[in-house]
C-alpha cells in the first residue's frame, strides 16, 4: 500500500491533516502566561522537569512563532488560542465559568456595584490577559479597608486591597498538541490521563467551536472526554489481552501518514512480568502511558481517522526500560507519547529511537468499506520497524547523531524527535545552545547533509531552553489547523 497522501477534500477551509509531511498551512499555539508561573513554583505536580524563567520562555515562544510566520505560505498562518476564542465569541463563556470575584467583605450594595464594574472591566481586557485569568481559574478577592479615615474627593476603592487566587491552573496549556489532534476527517478532542490536565479539553472544545466559521470549517469527529468505557474484546475477541482501563487519549500519540495513520497506545506487558516501581503486577497485560488501547479502538469504531489503515503502536516500555542506564523512575516520561521517540520527515523518511522502533509492535486495522464496522483487525502484533520498511520508509536512528558522552545527551534524546515537520523534508527542530559543540548540532547538521533535509530557521533550528522544562519541544507546542498536499 502506498504511503502517498490521498486527495484532500474539495474544501479549502476544512480543518484537517492528511500526512505529517504535507505542507503545513496554519497552526495554533498558546503563549504561556501567569497560569504557567504556578508550574514554575512547583514543577513536579505540574509535570515539569524543573523551574524556569517565564519571561525567557515567552521570548522563546515569540521567536518560534516568528519562525513559523516566515516559513508558512498562508497570509495568517499563526493562530493564538486567545485570539481564536475572542474572535469567535468563545471567551465570554469561559470567563463566566472559570473566573470569580469574591466581594464578601464589602457591604451588600457595594458588592453589586463593584461586581458589575469588575466584570465589565474583565470583558474589556486584552484576549491574552483574559485567557490567563481563564487558565488560572482565577478568583479576585477584594479586602475591605477598616480605616475610619476619610479623604474628601478620594475614591474609596483606593483604600481596599486585593488578593488573586489561582486554583489548580492549567499550567501545561502551551503544549497545544495534547488536548486534541487533527485527522483527515477532522478534530478529535482528547481525554487526558493526568488530573492536572483534564480541564484543558474544555478550553480546546471552546476554541474549536469558536474557530468554526468563515475561515475554517471545523468538524469535531470524536469527543473522547465524554467516553467513559469501551470493551475492545466485544469487537475484537482475539484481543482478549486488553484490560479494562480508562478511555484515555492524548494528541502527542497521533500521526497522519497519508493512506495510513498511527496512534501510540498502552504498552504490552508479557505474561508473568512485573514492574513494582511502576505498579505493574504479574497479572497485568498492558501499561498505560498516556493513551489506552481501548481509546484507540473506540476511535476506529467512530471512524475518526479517515485513512485506509490505522496502526495502534504499542509503547516500547520494556525496550526503554532495558535501555535506561539509570533508575530515575522516569522511563514512562521518556516515551510519554509517540512523538517523544518517533517522527516523520517525508513520505520515505522517519527519525526515531531505532531500538525502540525495532522492539515494539503495532496492530494494523484496515478499512472495511461498507462493512458492519469501519475497521477490522487485519494484522496483529506486527513489528513496527518492519511495518515502516514495508511502507517504504528509511529509519534514521537518533543515536547516529548524538554523542553518548555529551553532558546534555539525556536532554537531547527527550527532544530530538519532537521537531515540527512544516513540509516534505523541511523541519523545525529544537537546539539548546549556540555553541558548535552543542548536543543537537550533530543531528541538525547531519540530517541536512546526509538526507537533504531543510532545517529552519537558517539551518540551525530554534534555541529553546525554558519552554523545554515541560518535557515537550516544538511538535508538542503546536497543533495543525490545516496540513494538506499542495
UniProtKB/Swiss-Prot annotation:
Induction trigger: No induction in fermentatively grown cells.
EC number from the UniProt entry: 3.5.3.6
Catalytic activities: L-arginine + H2O = L-citrulline + NH4(+)
CC terms in the record's Gene Ontology section: cytoplasm
GO terms classed as biological process: arginine catabolic process to ornithine; arginine deiminase pathway
GO MF term list: arginine deiminase activity
Alphabetized Pfam families for the sequence: ADI
Protein name per its UniProtKB record: Arginine deiminase
The organism of origin for this protein: Halobacterium salinarum (strain ATCC 29341 / DSM 671 / R1)
